[in-house]
Amino acid sequence: MTAALDPQRTLRELKELRALTSDENGAQRVAFTPIWAKARDWLRQKLEELFLEIHRDEAGNVWATLAGESDQALVIGGHIDSVPNGGWLDGSLNLLAGLEILRRIKTQYSGKPPVSVRLVDWADEEGARFGMSLFGSSACSGHINLAETRGLQDKDGIALIDALAEHGIDFERLKDSGRELQNAEAYIELHIEQGPILLDLDLALGAVLGTFGVERHAITFRGQAAHSGSTPMNRRRDAFLAAAKMSPESYRIANHHGGVCTIGTCSTLPGIATSVVAECRITLDQRHLDPAALARMLEEARHSSDRFAEEGDVSVSWERLMRIEPIPFDSELLALCDEAIRETCGAVYCLPSGPLHDAAEVARAGIPTAMMFVQSLYGISHNKIEDTKEEHIEAAVIAFDKLAEKAMQLMVRPGRSTDAERNS
């Protein structure tokens, strides 16, 4: 750790932000709300102390740039927005660790590092208000679906387009933000794990292999409504019975392939206590880092649903709700992340990310990307009890700073090639 890096300052600033933007129920920095704007003003004041070039792009992402000897840029990303009643670290740790790294780099290199270093606060990573996650980063990557996004409204009926306008953002120009990635040569992101894997392994930090691919479907079983008292069990065409069999089957499929499956919603018709279920709709969310394994998981689930439908003399239909391809992160940056963690903590574990992150959108744009996870106490996030040990936060800032330095040195190394170039 260099003298200019102060992980305890990151801790103090995280607590300062918590006091400013949280209540007894947790963090309230929902994007495109007054508290979120207040948090951004607070962050901007911190950035202005470093005399950086600061601006907001067409999608509402805020960029702070320390110009270097080269225009090629190392980008450090995070998000200051939260879910309602959220935790104090999700997203904000990324930004404030990045802020501390900017301080160190500016001091060490007398204001002129070998490459430009940029910190970005992505707009609306959580999607808590309008239901669309990764808003700012997907606009910047060019993958945002404007047709689907145009009609989004919050629970009060306020249109996303109108909320954007209130914050000075023109919906029609969202994709113009893509110019921000033109000189990006590497992207790194620190994040709390939001799960229990590092906790169970008793490890402070982990290197992220990539983000899971997602197959999310609605599955509807249709049978026959009948009186619950007068219909014998062997004469029922019970849609719920067939749907219920999918629950243990989803666990079998997930365990067999090393992925995860979740049946998250279930609704029935006619939905009364005195009727056999005529229609049962469930949602199945399947995730895996390997696209072939994810495809096999989906195929097995389809075959199983057909079998259960036949056994119960009901029909079944599928509707795709979401498909996201698995996104592996850059192997060279992953090796540097592994190295930085070993130098800091002595041990490291490589794991995939189940949740989606802005890093995935940057990787989809073709920018070499790496992520580092820090252990989450209780394995819980998106909750006011979200927490991480202070010594682990400090270790994360130190290791993340090492990764930033290693990434900069990699960028100026002659003959460097990316995964995409090596595989072309």
Go through the PLM ranges and name each one:
Residues 10-18, 77-78, 278, 348-399:
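Zn-dependent metallopeptidase/amidohydrolase metal-coordination segment
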Residues 21-67:
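A non-catalytic alpha/beta surface segment that caps or lines the substrate-entry region
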Residues 28-32, 264-272, 283-290, 315-334, ...:
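A short beta-alpha structural unit
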Residues 44-48, 53, 63-157, 161-165, ...:
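Active-site metal-coordination/substrate-binding segment of hydrolases
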Residues 76, 86-126, 215-221, 227-253, ...:
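Alpha-helical metal-binding/catalytic segments enriched in His/Glu/Asp
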Residues 125, 131-292:
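Midchain, well-structured core segments that form catalytic/ion-binding scaffolds
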Residues 209, 227, 231-256, 303, ...:
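His/Asp/Glu-rich mid-to-C-terminal helical/loop segments that flank catalytic regions of hydrolases
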